[in-house]
Regions:
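Substrate/ligand-engaging "lid" and interaction regions
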Residues: 2-435, 442
Length: 442
């Protein structure tokens, strides 16, 4: 019986190609709603009778999926916001797929709310969820957070609690997720035509492209007598080890390869598949630095992932998927947001710290960090690099300049391994010069 009701915030490729898709395919939902402020996107799906298309990149081609019976609502439109609040009050599952956790409480000139006459009107996602829960008719509600932050659920719960008050833990639970599913929006008409992609809906020059991979982890649901309507997610009592495997494994190596690809002048990640030298660098960083440290840290769990064989399978699968010609991920997308990705505790330097903690030299991760600095300098304007740090050609940097850039990237934060981290990156410069020279001849 389709007794569940689903509401999703944000309608990008993960919401559309994962949460809404799985809700629809499960047959367990009587109503599926997506809240999206892009009116052009809302209109296109609505005009297509609530149906949209997702292109699924497999190892040997692309499949087209059609998802039906989706209600699109724009929370910035007063009438639709009221409908959304009614749906939220009945929702058994809610999923947030926003650009970052910073968007939970955005949405009004007055933080959290705007006022129309005497009636406060909720605008932020946290406010909308809080007001929906206040009027809840559902026996229970779980809220999936998919913002690629290992504390997303706690952050959203705190934001909602400030507006709602104490939540009933017997009826409401906020869940973290580990989503290793790569995806993108293709907006180039030429690429859409050449690759024979199907657009999201007729009249909209955009296409969702997601990979086939579907092993999604979520916090275990603890609400009594409640079974999630989306049944394919794998529940874990403690997600932190798997979140670290994604950040220091998947995300770190993806960024490393993306930065090196950008420094070498590549445009597509699939170009790396035939460059055995670069792929071996990625593989060594994955297995001998990230993987070796994670296995030492989490071997006590006795989970297959944190064994040599399990992590090797995980790494080899990801290296193939990262360079999948049917996903055709762009180097520009993978190497974007370089300032955040080179933060002290982020994917590159966070992995290096983890390796050093377990007595492992992070020489390949350091190469990725140096390549990231090269990307930063090549796109100094785009990344708002201060004028006094725009040193030009990364090949001509001396150690002092590399250190200045790293200190700026870390926002003057430090850690016990700071000097070692900086030295590893400085030492990686010559190796990157040699690698990019070889790339030019490849």
């Amino acid at each position: 019986m389709a007794a569940h009701i689903f509401t999703g915030f944000g309608f990008g490729p993960i919401q559309a190609g994962l949460f809404v898709k799985e809700a629809f395919q499960s047959g367990n939902f009587s109503r599926i709603v997506a809240a999206e402020i892009d009116q052009e996107l809302v209109n296109a799906v609505r005009a297509n009778n609530g149906s949209y298309y997702v292109n699924v990149a497999k190892a040997d081609g692309i499949d087209i999926l059609k998802i039906d019976h989706v209600e699109m609502l724009n929370p910035n439109v007063a009438e639709e916001r009221e409908i959304l609040l009614q749906v939220l009050a009945e929702s058994t599952e809610i999923a947030t797929c926003l650009p970052s956790v910073d968007f939970y409480d955005r949405g009004s000139a007055i933080p959290g709310r705007v006022f129309t006459g005497w009636k406060p009107v909720p605008r932020s996602v946290a406010s909308l969820i809080a007001d929906g829960l206040k009027s809840s008719k559902a026996k229970a509600t779980i809220i999936y957070t998919a913002e690629n932050n290992n504390r997303a659920a706690e952050i959203l719960e705190q934001a909602v609690t400030k507006k709602f008050g104490t939540l009933s833990r017997e009826k409401v639970q906020f869940l973290n997720t580990v989503i290793g599913k790569m995806s993108r929006v293709v907006a180039n008409p030429t690429e859409i035509a050449e690759r024979k992609l199907v657009t999201i809906a007729p009249g909209l020059q955009r296409a969702f492209l997601v990979e086939e991979f579907n092993r999604i982890l979520a916090t275990r649901t603890r609400i009594s007598n409640f079974r999630p309507g989306i049944e394919v997610f794998i529940e874990k009592d403690d997600l932190l080890p798997f979140e670290e495997a994604k950040l220091f494994g998947h995300n770190a190596i993806h960024a490393l390869l993306g930065f090196i690809a950008a420094a070498c002048g590549c445009s597509r990640m699939t170009e790396l598949a035939d460059n055995q030298r670069i792929m071996q660098i990625g593989r060594a960083a994955f297995l001998q630095e990230s993987g070796a440290a994670l296995i030492k840290k989490y071997a006590y769990l006795r989970d297959e992932l944190f064994t040599e064989a399990g992590f090797r399978d995980y790494a080899e699968d990801l290296l193939q998927r990262m360079t999948n010609p049917y996903l055709a991920d762009t180097v520009a997308r993978v190497s974007r947001d370089v300032v955040r990705k080179l933060g002290l505790n982020e994917r590159i330097f966070g992995t290096m710290q983890l390796a050093l903690e377990y007595g492992i030299e992070p020489t390949n991760m350091a190469l990725g960090a140096m390549a990231g600095i090269a990307v930063l300098l090549m796109k100094a304007e785009e990344n708002n690099l201060p004028t006094d740090l725009r040193f030009g050609d990364w090949r001509k940097l001396n150690d002092a300049k590399i250190e200045k850039i790293i200190i700026w990237l870390w926002n003057s934060q430090t850690c016990k391994y700071a000097e070692q981290l900086i030295k590893y990156v400085q030492n990686a410069q010559e190796r990157l010069k040699e690698l990019t020279t070889d790339c030019a001849d490849f």
